[in-house]
Each structure stands twice: as structure tokens, then as C-alpha cells.
Amino acid sequence: MGRAVSVAACALNQWALDFEGNAERILRSISIAKSKGARYRLGPELEICGYGCADHYYESDTLLHSFQVLAKLLESPATQDIICDVGMPLMHRNVRYNCRVIFLNKKILLIRPKISLANAGNYRELRWFTPWNKARHVEEYLLPRIIQEVTGQDTVPFGDAVLATKDTCLGTEICEELWAPNSPHIEMGLDGVEIFTNSSGSHHVLRKAHTRVDLVNSATAKNGGIYILSNQKGCDGDRLYYDGCAMISMNGETVAQGSQFSLDDVEVLVATLDLEDVRSYRAEISSRNLAASKVNPFPRIKVNFALSCSDDLSVPICVPIQWRHHSPEEEICLGPACWLWDYLRRSKQAGFLLPLSGGIDSSATACIVYSMCRQVCLAVKNGNSEVLADARKIVHDETYIPEDPQEFCKRVFTTCYMASENSSQDTRNRAKLLAEQIGSYHINLNIDAAVKAIVGIFSMVTGRTPRFSVYGGSRRENLALQNVQARVRMVPAYLFAQLTLWTRGMPGGLLVLGSANVDESLRGYLTKYDCSSADINPIGGISKTDLKNFIQYCIENFQLTALRSIMAAPPTAELEPLMDGQVSQTDEADMGMTYAELSIYGKLRKIAKAGPYSMFCKLINLWKEICTPREVASKVKHFFRMYSVNRHKMTTLTPSYHAENYSPDDNRFDLRPFLYNTTWSWQFRCIDNQVSHLEKKEGISVAEDTD
């Protein structure tokens, strides 16, 4: 009858410029799709070269090697008798485009350039590509000789068209086009397109997955149709983790769901769906049919191929399922862990070293590494031969099988407690107990000799000896002595990362992990070039509030009882002298604000685009039950002073896993100056004027604010 179509969506762990590996994963996904009965296979955005090539897109080599891979795909027997939809950059009339190349049996059917480019947040597509602005227009694209020799075609259609097979009609969207207000699927659906495809390069952000799922389902809820979404997965070379979530939806309901976090390099979803369900769904939507009668038609590329078989009554049809979302704590547990695994295996290092202080942040980082070890053991148990091969390379043992997370952790994870005279026995014990429970190779060392040597050099040169404030020193002296301790810790961290495995008779070196959270980075509550200066930081995009919830999750799910005392202890840097052996310094007292307040400031500054005055205006309403306008003004001023004074620290911040949309990451997400006029005189005067107006209105008499 020709009504049951079988289609495949893929999530591939591609790597920028890894043309060899990318081609292998694409071919494997096509073979899997065919083995499951699919007649159409959709891959992620720019899958041939990997999405994160950045300025390598300018290079002609990137285009050349992409065409070489395309030729390999066209020639492969695996790509025969299935419509293959792959992504790559190419140049048309001296303009670079982000494209889908759709082919069947060594013939290119259509090259579809991206219409709406992603250019916000971490995305910079307009830097490298140009959008195709010729709606419903097709031109002839002259193929390079390397492709002509395979296909026998000189030119192929290039532009905004749809494919008309023998049994249905397919239309293409590329990532951002689904998120755009005028998504192409709207007009395509009105023009009779029944299957919409979307190849994405969408990265993970906490609590974002439901938005993507809702967009896909809503795309066909009003207009009917089948929607296929493929996405990249894994770390392809930078701060982002692409979180898969391949899915297939029909008439507003999910029928197939892929994993969001997985160590599988290739994941293929196949669904068989009844086209008559789409047609009957549309038939009763009179508003849709009236709109369809007025739509301008898309150019149709006729394809002598069917996505269904002639006798399909016995083919089982997929039914709707309920999408299973991860909690934020599960996302923190799994996303950064998968990112760390990709970084470790692709950097060809032998593990990680973490300065473990016994506080929440470094403990959360340790738990993420432990989660990675659990994921590796689970993947090997489930038969993932690639993970097993990677694990053996990392530990330099061709017969090794990671079965126990603690045992694997001992091989690949070193933790180091770096004590000073200001460290408490409590934090030392907490770090030791947590290391024992997760299985890391743990080291205790003391940095006092190094600190005294450096301060001694200063005293010898200047004739002056700085003192902590509790001993009569000035604020400058106090801060300098704290920073010396913090900075000294960076040097042994890298030394032990290079040589710890050597002392254990094991080959390789370790990557140093940092543990500064997103709130502390925003406030600048960290020492430049201290042990937060590391190779990578898995928690740098995560708030303190979420980290606390994650720690509680680990207590409940991993039975890490050592975390209970860590959760109960107030966060402290332990850089000032102890009082009667007890900690006298706390982070929130040092910062002059709470972590909860910092999260609010961060979201207003970045997500709500609020400067000092706008933030004040929003907070006087948000906090009207707990703060007077003058108190709100004081808090806002203090935040912006500290933010601007410390912004320079972001320029050298350790590359961090991107998890929050209010991240202050200076690399490309949050582009700001790092030399500010920290008085904010005009802005703060506007706040003061508004405070005076509000107090006058309320009949409050307050002395002039000199803050």
C-alpha cells in the first residue's frame, strides 16, 4: 500500500576536523539504520567536519577534506538503497554555506543551505557562513571533479527545495530554523510536506532539553506531520557538550527518544510510521487547509524511490511514548562526566589530578569524575567495545577490563589535599574520607615551606614582612598572604600531575582539574593563577545552589556518606589563620553576598540583560518583602563593583563545561570589557536618585548615602 515509512535519526559523537573518525561514524550509523529497515537516514549538523571547527571553516582544507569524505560516503556500498542526509560546509559562487547534502545511490539529489543561522550565546555562525536568503529558489551547483567522478553529475540543485519521493514529501530544517519565529516547517507543511527533518548542533544547558522537545512536538501539533531530529553528541573540542536527544515525533507526540548522555559514539533511532495518520490528522484542521490553499509552492525534486514498501500491512507501527527528562542533578552527574571522558580519551592522557580541599566545589568535581568511572564500567558491561578500547589505552593495559568504578578510579584519578598552617583537621579528614569512598589515589602534602620561602624572598628584598589582619596587618597584607597560599598550590598541582604516575611506575601524565563554580567566577571570588588555574573545569558553568543539590543526589544515589559532613560545613577558602583550631573565614562573609544572591545577580545581568540601574529596578520589587530600596541599592552597587574589579580574571579562566546561560565565560559566551570604570558614577547616581524618590514618596528621612 505504501503508507508505512521507516526513517532514522542519529546522534553521533563527532570531533572537529577528525575527518577519518567522523566518516567512520557516519558510515556505521548508515549501516545500522539500514539493518533496522530505515529508508532514510538523517545525521547531525556539519557532521562530516564536526560542528566546532570555528575559524577552521575559513580554510580551504576544511572544504576539500569534507568533499573527500563525501566522495567516500557516495562510493560506499553502505549508502546504497537508502536516502542519506549528511551535513558539511561548502562554497557556492565564492560564498560559504552550512549545508545538507542529500543523496541516493551515488546521485546527489539536493544541496540545501541553511536559512537561519545561529548567532547568539556560544554560536557564531554568521562569522563563517552566509544564510540562504532566496526563499523557494534553486540554482545549479557545479560539483568539484572529485564528486563528478563518483556521481557522473556535473551540476546538482542547490537551494530551498523539498524532495518528492514516490510515496511522500520531505522538507529540511537545520537546527536554528526550528527555533526561529518563522520556521520553514510551517510553510512546508502547508505545501504538503509530510516529513520534516532537522539536523542539529545543539549543546547542553541545564534544564534546556524540555524546550527542544517541546519545539519539535509543537512543530507538528498544529499542522500535522512527522518530525525527525538528529543532533551531535559529546565534546568535539571545546567547552560545549552536545547532548544528543535524537528524536522522532508525529502529530505532536514523541514516538522515539534517544539518550541525552551516553558514551556510545553512534546512536541510531528508527521509527516506522503510517503516513495516513498524518493525512487524517490534517484533514480535520480546517484552518490549516484554508491556509494551504494560499501558500506559494516549494520547488520539488522528484526522487524515484519510496520510503515505504508496497506490502506493509504486517509492518508494526510505532506508538507515542512519554519523554523521560533528567532532573538537574542527573544532568550534572552525567553531562560533565561524559564531557570529561571525551576530553580524557581524545587528549591521550592517563587520567586526572584534582586539588581536593574537602569543600563542596572540589568534592562535586570529584563526584563527577567518579560518575565518569561508573559510566565507563557500565558501558563496558553493556558491551561497548569502543569504551573498553579507550579505557585500555588510558591505563596502558591491553588486557584490562574496567568492572569496578572504585578500582578504575584508583587508576585514572589522583586527588591531592594541599594543607597549610591555616587548614583545619576537619577539611583534611573530609577530603581523605571522600577519596577513600570513590577510590581515588589520594595524596596529602603541606605547602607551608613553599609559602614561607616566597614570603621570605619578599622580606629579604624589601626589609618588610607582611602580616595577617588578625596579627595587626593591613587589608593589603592580609590579601597578599592569602593569594600567596592560593597561587603556590597551582605549581605542585601541575608537578604532581606530571610525575605522580611516574612515582607509581605507571606511564603517562594527568590533566589538572579546576573547581571554581559559576557564581564565584561571576563575583571574581577566586585568585588569579591559583589552583583554579587548571587544564579544564567540569563545574565552572554550574551554580553553587545546583552543586549543593548534586552533592545531596550523590549521597542518596552513590552512598557517599563522606559528603554529609561536607554539605553541613560552611564554604571556606581556609586562607586566614584559624581561631582556636577552628575556621574563622567563610566564603559568603568574604564576598559580602550570599550564593543565592549571586545566582540572581548573574541571571539578571546576563539573561535579563540588566545593567546596574535595571537590576536595581527589578530587585526592589523582587525583594520588597526583605529589603528596603536603600538596602537593595547597596547590594546592587557592591555586586557591580566586585564584578567589574574582578572581570579581568575571566580572561584567563580555565576552560569550563558550559552549563548555565548566565555564565561569565569570557571566551565567546559573555563578551565584555575587562577594564571598567569601577565607580559606575552615572549608573549609581541614577540608582541613588530613584532611592531618594522612593524614600520621599514613603516619607522616609535618611542621611545621604555615601556608599
UniProtKB/Swiss-Prot annotation:
Pfam families associated with the record: CN_hydrolase (PF00795), NAD_synthase (PF02540)
CDD domains named in the record: GAT_Gln-NAD-synth, NAD_synthase
GO biological process: 'de novo' NAD biosynthetic process from L-tryptophan; NAD biosynthetic process
Residue ranges of domain CN hydrolase in the record: 5-275
Pathway terms, separated by semicolons: Cofactor biosynthesis; NAD(+) biosynthesis; NAD(+) from deamido-NAD(+) (L-Gln route): step 1/1
Residue ranges, annotated region (Ligase): 325-706
Gene3D superfamilies in the record: Carbon-nitrogen hydrolase, HUPs
The keyword ATP-binding is assigned to this record: yes
Active-site residue numbers: E45, K114, C175, S357
One Gene Ontology cellular component: cytoplasm
Catalytic activity: deamido-NAD(+) + L-glutamine + ATP + H2O = L-glutamate + AMP + diphosphate + NAD(+) + H(+)
Positions contributing to ATP binding: P355, L356, S357, G358, G359, I360, D361, S362
UniProt cross-references to HAMAP family, sorted A to Z: NadE_glutamine_dep
Subunit text: Homohexamer.
The protein, known as: Glutamine-dependent NAD(+) synthetase
Originating species: Gallus gallus
Lineage: Eukaryota, Metazoa, Chordata, Craniata, Vertebrata
